[in-house]
Amino acid sequence: MKNAPAVSFSAMPSADAERPILVFDSGIGGLTVLREARVLMPDRRFVYVADDAGFPYGGWEEDALRERIVELFGKLIAAYDPEIAVIACNTASTLVLDDLRQAYPSVPFVGTVPAIKPAAERTSSGLVSVLATPGTVRRAYTRDLIQSFATQCHVRLVGADQLATVAEAHIRGERIDEALVVEQIAPCFIEQDGNRTDIVVLACTHYPFLANVFRRLAPWPVDWLDPAEAIARRTVSLLKPRRADEELHHHNDLAVVTSRNPDYAIRRLMQGFGLHFA
């Protein structure tokens, strides 16, 4: 069982601050979702939360991780009063989204789930792979998506136990082991009855940061399906429209890291995304 220190958060900077959109991930992979959300909602305020004290989530027992995330959100909601919360993490979404909605019914939650439905609609060969963390692969929720939307396809679930950590290293500018990447993605590629896998669903928000590496190392071209834009669109659809005469008190977008001690590479990355540390 993995443990992480308890965390607390400061209150929002002022009483008249605009209620933010809170984007949450276990690390920095959710920045892919933040990037798309800002494109669609440039006038909104964001708080990005990286639970780096608990990263990676794959090392946790499910009950302990569920308890941690639900408790963490109680503190985040009290501190930042978000208008909506985006769980930009497949592992957290498939495990705890229902618990969060039950615990905090006043806050709308948008989850991140494997993009199996659009993959099934888009595939030409009928061979689709889902590249995910082992936790996401294990969850009944993922298999329910296949049963609901992709019974006409052959869907292979691939649990990559090291890619999220590799992605974090890549984002930091560190050298990565490309042989390890090849080993992790190889099971995604199937040849069957003259057909080949033509879509790989990126079912972890860290993975789009490795998309160019995947393309270069893949045995043949496929469509690497990134759900970030769809998550951003769903968020927009749940927000209340602004009044034409609404006066905004826009403050800086914030970065919150639960370790309270981000290293230089993370600080530089967050600042490159225009985030200010809380």
Swiss-Prot record:
A matching Pfam family: Asp_Glu_race
Entry-linked InterPro entries: Asp/Glu/hydantoin_racemase (IPR015942), Asp/Glu_race (IPR001920), Asp/Glu_racemase_AS_1 (IPR018187), Asp/Glu_racemase_AS_2 (IPR033134), Glu_race (IPR004391)
Keyword Disulfide bond: no
Protein residues bound to substrate: 25-26, 57-58, 90-91, 205-206
Keyword set, alphabetical order: Cell shape, Cell wall biogenesis/degradation, Isomerase, Peptidoglycan synthesis
Record PROSITE patterns: ASP_GLU_RACEMASE_1 (PS00923), ASP_GLU_RACEMASE_2 (PS00924)
Active-site residues annotated for this sequence: 89 (proton donor/acceptor), 204 (proton donor/acceptor)
Pathway in which this enzyme or protein is active: Cell wall biogenesis; peptidoglycan biosynthesis
The EC number(s) this enzyme carries: 5.1.1.3
Coiled coil: none
EC class name: isomerase
Catalyzed reaction equations: L-glutamate = D-glutamate
GO biological process, one term: peptidoglycan biosynthetic process
Domain of life: Bacteria
GO molecular function: glutamate racemase activity
Cell membrane in keyword set: no
Task performed by this protein: Provides the (R)-glutamate required for cell wall biosynthesis.
Entries under PANTHER family matching the protein: GLUTAMATE RACEMASE
Family: Belongs to the aspartate/glutamate racemases family.
Protein name: Glutamate racemase
Protein species of origin: Brucella anthropi (strain ATCC 49188 / DSM 6882 / CCUG 24695 / JCM 21032 / LMG 3331 / NBRC 15819 / NCTC 12168 / Alc 37) (Ochrobactrum anthropi)
Gene that encodes the chain: murI
